[in-house]
Amino acid sequence: MGIFRDDWQELTESRNVGSIYLTHLIRGRSDKYSYNTLLKILESGFLRASFSRRNNYDTVKGNQKVVCFQDTSFDAMQEIITGEKWLDREQGYREFGIQMPKEILFYNGARPVIYDKANEIMELIDESIYWRVVNLDLNIATWQYVDWTHEHEWRIPGDVMLESGDFRVIVKTEEYKKRLIHEPGMKKLIKKPKNIIVFENEVSKNIELS
């Protein structure tokens, strides 16, 4: 038995683990690089699907390109970003991205990924949903671990169109928000300033509430 939407939203937000929004965080070697990537996304009007290539390796199984999101709170995103910096990943996540309502993405085909040993689970499921598989391998024999479960990842096949009113933009600081508002064409695309979310403010807000 389900619950009403308002109850679902209240429960989800009170848990401070997931969110009613799914977040597409942007990777980049610097804040400047990630901000410029964000601008290109906004100017194109799409999140482009890919095979999510990392270290010259496609992380998406099968032949279906996807757009990746995370079902996480801002606190959890901060931990993910901090962890990537600790691992010294050149193309790590930055505090820039796009958020879209989870229910709309779900309606359009987005689903949580399946964390499991890829070679085992792919023998049990249809090839048409290989795109949902993310390899999980905690190999105590070799002490070589592959574990992305902290990302709480969702994926959706194909490009995702950014429709006015149905997305929010994440920028790192107030300074980047002011800069974004004055970029050519942004006032028309992002009609409400409240739809530009300042990452550091959201994290600070949660610290004050705790």
Task: Annotate each language-model stretch with its function.
Residues 1-210:
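NAD-dependent ADP-ribosyltransferases
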